[in-house]
Amino acid sequence: MAYLTDDKASGPEWALLLEQCISHRIISTEFRDFSVIMMRRHPISEKALIRIVLEARSATGLMWDPLIPLYVEVLQKLGYVSLPEILKTLLLFSTIYDDSHPVSKAGPNGKGVKRKKKTSTLMTDNKIIQNVMATITMGQGPKATRGATDVLCAVADWISTLLAWSPSGEGPESDQPGDILGHQDGACIFGSLGLLLVALVGTEKGVSALSSLSKKDRKCLGQALSSYTPICASYSLPLRNRLDSIQKDFNIYPSDSSKGLEESMMGDVNVAVLQFESNVVDIPTTSSRAGLYIYINALLAGRPLIDDSMFLNYLNNRYGGDHISMVEELITAAFDVLSNGMYRNESSKTMFLFRAFLVNKLPPFLAYMSASSMSQIPMEVCITRALSRVDPNTFPSFSETFSMQGNSVLSDVRQEFLFSCALHKLIPESSIERLLGENPMQTLPVGGQFMKDTLIAQINNNPERAEQLLNGIESMEGNAGAIVDAIIEVMHNLCSRKETMTLKSICNSLSRRPQTLDIILLFKSPSFILQPLCSLLDAWKWDEDQGESQLVYDEFGSILLLVLAFKYKYDLTPLDLGINKPDSFILRLLDTGASSQQLKDLTEKQNQNLGAWITALFVAEGISDESMSSCSPQEFYLLVATLFSQSLTACEAGKMEFETLKGGFEYLLEPFLLPALVMALTWLGNHIWESESDLETSLKILHGLVKPASISGEAQEIHRTVLCIASRTLEATLKDTRARHPSRTDISPILDVLEQYHSFRRTGATNQTELDSWRANPAGGGLVTSIRNTFSSLVLWSTDPEISMTPPSYTHRQMLAGIGHVGSERVLQGLIDELKLQTETGSGNLAFDIAATLICAPMAESFTLEQILYRQMDQDKYPLPGCRMLTLRDALGIQRESLSKLIEADPHRAELIIRLHRRVEALCSIPQIAPGDVDVGNIMDSIHLEAVGGDDEQREQHQQQQPDADQSNQGVVAPTGNTPGNLDAMLDAAASAVVADPNGTAGAEAAAGAGLLGNGVGGDAGVGIGTGMNDVFSLMDMGNPEFIDLDMEDML
């Protein structure tokens, strides 16, 4: 019903009502009835009414009064004020606006007069904005496009003003825009505004408004979003991504002048995509047995890609709160991977890694998972069920091995796993016999469970203890994790204290144990391990007077060799190594260490160093300490390739005898110089490959360095590590050279020596035989068809895995080979083709889970970058490089962004892509810990729901807590019917309960009994807000004292 308004006459009456209601703490249901009466007697415009309500809050002088948001909500529900007007006027009366507009009018002297500093309104502002968002989410938003447009413009004004606001109060120039996130209340408003915009765009009128914005409004909103989204990346990545998508889909940018007609016309198509997507209903999710089987295979296909937090986050995304299924299927999958490895005849080193994951990694991870769970996980039950599902032929009992024909490779694995579980307190030791079904043939380790701090203390007291621990790190007893933690922490401490002698000993021990490096990466990332080592090498101070130079070279070389062993074994990038400085010595060595320089390009110091080393190696009788003291280790390693180039050129030109050259290079077989052979052999291999003339001298030198006639015992282990590092590169160049010079007989002996070192590298690359088998598909289609066949076999096995406990043959190297040889986009097309086929045959649920897992599975090329993004580390100081290749997830994102044409051509395929993209993003979602403890993820999920319902049990408990308050309302004089009596009389009657006791005690109790505390401070306001929505948005109120028992006496 419309009223003729007279703001001038009605304003004082409404102001009096608000003053009385606030001072007497009138609950929202009573305020609603009073407002109905008041509007009939004293009609008023919405602009004047909302101004009066907001002005009334200043009378309390409190930062937070819960009644104000409730009163505003009541008036909005009654239709007396609209959502756009609430937001517009709220901004004008906000602390943010006051601080951003300090001058209000000219004074008598003509100068501006600053406003008086008022109590902060931010907590109230935030709650009102949240209520607006709740209203829109529950389908009670603007009914017309114009109203939605006004809300968008109001939000844009809020964002612009908020970002111009100075939290420090010293003016906008004193703070950076991102500083708003450091202010708790400001950060809450920042998040609420973004979520409000997302909520509005989720409605039909919101989409219509965005599609029909005027040029002025589009520019205003575009400017606001362009300023908001960069800061939002530090607040919530899902929110930022959603706003980015909105801005792109609706072409909302500050200026449209640079955009062509074709791009502008895409707006309608993008809206159609959004509408199409909103009609795509997700199918029920299923966790197939093949899912974790694929994922663990991917974790261990190359270098171990394990980050406990990320892995647990993936498992939580996959299983939700079903911890029992999570644990049971995780154990089962680990056994399946080991079983598959045996049937595929994987290498002994791969089988060792699979076994180490099951025995040494999984039990402590389960203990970590159990400790972080809010509810107790029945581990023994889970383990019992998991063991009942593993293939008995692959994991026979000890007694069964006697009746089997040699198939007892994994006979000890079950009891190794169980004893490791007992070691980590997952099960009692007494349960092992029952779980095995026979008497165990081993016991718990003699020393029991190792503790990191104890081991560190032992190493500090006796450095030789580190060597003893490393000798036992590869045993299958369950203590590897503690050993790794202790060794790495000791290394980091030695780096910080620059105790390089002890550090050298540990690095040498690790360098000669390639399998130990695999074990270490089950527990620690390469960047965590190596960053302190790289920093130490980068910052190594060289003093010519520091003492024995050979000892310094020895220590430096040992540390460097371990870094190089990690780098070449796992094909690590500078980001993987933890290098973030462009002038890093390690970075320069990796980039240019194997490349020689022309003499004219050397600096004077480099020329001096080069001459000194040539003299020491080929002229003098040996390398003296004096000849080394003038050249730092860093300078020497960067000169090695040039030293070889100049020396070999001199020999080939007849300026140096071959025996002199050979004898000089043999000095590099001394332990303190041996690591330099990595650069020397790499350069020499490239030189041989590039040479078209005489190769005699180069090949003789290479053979002498690869297979020296004599070498000391200490140097043998280092030499073996050097050949492990350089063998792959040398093999490729020598095979190509042999193909060009088939008559030469001096190349094959070198290749024969290098062959034993090929298994050193672990990168997930496939061998040529395996690759050819995947390409040679009888049906055609090559690698992609082979991947589809593998996909199909995984779906078939997951349909009923109990029929065949033996898992289908699978290696994630096949996926990696497909991505590397034909590209992620073609592999993805094959997966979607097979997904479509499986969906049509009734296996859609399982196929979606398997396809999503294949896409989510980690890759070495992107893993470190994903780790950094997962932890949201500071990326401003050192910008992150892009991923080395397009991942399957990236390719799916591109498919998702280009659906407009596919929707018309193949809507079924478009639906598959949308569902698959949702499933992948759900599995890969990162938990956001936003400022103010705002659970943005839950709120975002709620916004996309058609209806938000509360938890029935919580609602029941809430109702059980309210009966006393509801009953006590009967004793309060409240209006009845639609035509209550005299307003003043009713106000006086309502206030009588408050003022009955002159001391205020009874008044406070009466107020509480009347439901003022319960309803006025976060209870049921009686204005149509459901409990479910209150639950959803309650986490946004951590900055507000709604959850504190307010002192009502002080408020009266």
UniProtKB/Swiss-Prot annotation:
GO biological process: one example: regulation of transcription by RNA polymerase II
UniProt feature, compositional bias: Low complexity: 959-970
InterPro entries from the UniProt entry: Mediator_Med5_fun
Pfam families registered for this protein in UniProt: Med5
MF annotations from Gene Ontology: transcription coregulator activity
Top-level lineage group: Eukaryota
Record's keyword annotation contains Transit peptide: no
This protein's GO CC annotations: mediator complex
Predominant subcellular localization, coarse grouping: nucleus
Stretches for region Disordered: 949-982
Location in or out of the cell: Nucleus
Keywords: Activator, Nucleus, Transcription, Transcription regulation
Subunit (UniProt): Component of the Mediator complex.
Function comment: Component of the Mediator complex, a coactivator involved in the regulated transcription of nearly all RNA polymerase II-dependent genes. Mediator functions as a bridge to convey information from gene-specific regulatory proteins to the basal RNA polymerase II transcription machinery. Mediator is recruited to promoters by direct interactions with regulatory proteins and serves as a scaffold for the assembly of a functional preinitiation complex with RNA polymerase II and the general transcription factors.
Listed PANTHER family: MEDIATOR OF RNA POLYMERASE II TRANSCRIPTION SUBUNIT 5
Family: Belongs to the Mediator complex subunit 5 family.
Protein name: Mediator of RNA polymerase II transcription subunit 5
Source species of the chain: Coccidioides immitis (strain RS) (Valley fever fungus)
